[in-house]
UniProtKB/Swiss-Prot annotation:
GO terms for biological process: isoquinoline alkaloid biosynthetic process. It comes from the Eukaryota. It comes from Coptis japonica (Japanese goldthread). Expressed at low levels in roots. Its cofactor is heme. Heme binds at residue 434. This is (S)-canadine synthase. Keywords: Endoplasmic reticulum, Heme, Iron, Membrane, Metal-binding, Microsome, Monooxygenase, Oxidoreductase, Transmembrane, Transmembrane helix. GO terms for molecular function: (S)-canadine synthase activity; heme binding; iron ion binding; monooxygenase activity. Disulfide bonds: none annotated. Its main location: endoplasmic reticulum. PROSITE patterns: CYTOCHROME_P450 (PS00086). Belongs to the cytochrome P450 family.
Length: 491
């Protein structure tokens, strides 16, 4: 006997609605018992999702904060309340002054698959494991002496990158897609920090680049399950879980053979092996560096290039800053990057306009604490909107305008005041500030200086400016990857 398809669909819908209502009734009693900050009115089942509109999440939340206050409760679906902070004073209370209280993590369930069940720096709570691994990374592989030892290799890689872009432009009517070139350069740097300077395997680099792309694609499915509890049982989410598991297996297959090597003592692998961690933990602590380091540097660099294409005056100022400071050089050396004042302004302004992680990595209270004197229960989810802090018009004049001069002192710039300094948090702040912050800033500045020194950047078509639309994944990506026309500088 055949069943009526409409009857089947109706039955499924009724079951879904019934179980969702049951979930709402029972989950409300399990929420942290506290007085939640006010926020926009929520609807059954969907919570505040209907008020997030067509904007990317950080922009939508910034708009809601202007109406409902700088500390508000947002319901992601009907079962996940999140306190969203869009004010610098409250942000500092959470991130800095009470960083231990707010130092736990709130990660999507699907991320357990490729993080050794949340045993990595970014996904684990702020306990002894987290402290040990973070310290080992920062004092060893990312220590100042080890990073400085990479300079000659990075400068060699940059020459290769410039040559590769020149070749691409020559074969494509002057047009290039810079993102992949920058990504692969970053993979090479991280590979040397992880496995040692002698490691140079192009096949490994290509394979790791592919796995990073794949896990970022899959991560988008996590949002549906975060909003609707039973969405994790849908075929699309189950498919995402299977694909994430396949990435996990491929990453293990890629990295596992390297664990039996004898890495140099200043490498990240040497430190991880010395701690007698389980193999899975070692592999995914390594994968984490690629996952968070590659796209953050490459995406921020392409954002900067897009702004400089749109603002040709700023691009010319940067080029003249290089020429006036360093002369007619073929390559800007890493040791010279900090001499370039306008470059530093462009770097900071890009990170202000397009923070790498505009909502940081979500926090959760590790114990009962307070916010502005009001009780906040253990297990409460907290989100700090760094984008909102960076676009507060009371602190940043013309906040939506790209102005590197705002970070400069003197005749051509505005005074960089204390309020701006406290509100500029592209890498978050406090004990959970990005572990690779210093390296990330240096690589961004080094890449940008050399790309502007080597090429003049312009629109692919006259008058057709780069699309500045955003896509939020692990980091803030360009919705439409940058394409540009380049011409070699006559130096």
């Amino acid at each position: 006997m055949e069943m009526n398809p409409l009857l089947v669909c109706a039955t499924v819908a009724i079951v879904f609605a019934t179980t969702t209502i049951i979930r709402i009734l029972f989950s409300s009693s399990s929420l942290p018992q506290m007085k939640w900050p006010s926020g926009p009115r929520k609807l059954p089942i969907i919570g505040n999702l209907h008020q997030l509109g067509d904007d990317v999440l950080h922009v939508a939340l910034a708009k809601l904060a202007k109406v409902h206050g700088s500390v508000m409760t947002i319901w992601i679906g009907s079962w996940r309340p999140v306190i969203v902070i869009s004010d610098i004073e409250k942000a500092w209370e959470v991130l800095v002054n009470k960083s231990a209280d707010y130092g736990a993590r709130d990660m999507p369930e699907i991320t357990k698959i490729a993080s050794a069940s949340w045993h990595t720096i970014s996904t684990s709570d702020a306990g002894s494991f987290w402290q040990n691994v973070r310290k080992g990374l920062q004092s060893g592989a990312m220590g100042p002496l080890n990073v400085a030892a990479q300079n000659q290799y990075q400068e060699r890689d940059m020459k290769r990158l410039i040559k590769a872009m020149s070749d691409e432009a020559a074969n494509n009517n002057g047009i290039v897609k810079p993102l992949d070139h920058i990504k692969k350069n970053t993979v090479r740097l991280l590979t040397r920090l992880i496995f040692g300077q002698a490691f140079d395997d192009n096949k490994f680099i290509e394979s790791m680049h592919y796995e990073i792309e794949d896990i970022i694609r899959i991560s988008g499915y996590a949002r549906l399950a975060e909003a609707f509890y039973y969405a994790k049982y849908l075929p699309s989410h189950k498919k995402a879980e299977r694909e994430a598991f396949l990435v996990k297996c491929r990453v293990e297959e890629l990295v596992r053979p390297l664990l039996s090597s004898k890495p140099p003592t200043n490498s990240y692998l040497y430190f991880l092996l010395s701690q007698n961690f389980e193999e899975e933990v070692i592999i995914f602590c390594i994968f984490e560096l690629y996952l968070l380091g590659v796209d953050s540097t490459s995406s921020t660099t392409t954002w900067a290039l897009a702004y400089l294409i749109r603002e040709q005056g700023a691009q010319e100022k940067l080029y003249q800053d290089i020429r006036m400071t360093l002369g007619d050089v073929d390559l800007v050396k890493i040791e010279d990057v900090n001499k370039l004042k306008y470059l530093q302004g462009v770097v900071k302004e890009t990170m202000r306009m397009k923070p790498i992680a505009p909502l940081a990595i979500p926090h959760k209270t590790a114990k009962e604490t307070t916010l502005m004197g009001t009780k906040v229960a253990k297990g409460t989810r907290i989100m700090v909107n760094l984008y909102a802090l960076h676009h507060n018009q009371n602190i940043w004049p013309d906040p939506y305008k790209f102005m590197p001069e705002r970070f400069l002192e003197g005749e051509t710039g505005t005074a960089y005041n204390k309020a701006m300094e406290q509100s500029f948090l592209p890498f978050s702040a406090g004990m959970r500030i990005c572990a690779g912050m210093d390296l990330g800033k240096l690589q961004f500045a080094f890449a940008l200086a050399n790309l502007v020194n080597a090429f003049k950047w312009s629109c692919v078509e006259e008058g057709k400016l780069p699309d500045m639309g955003e896509e939020l994944s692990f980091v803030l990506l360009m919705k439409t990857p940058l394409e540009a026309r380049i011409a070699g500088r006559n130096v």
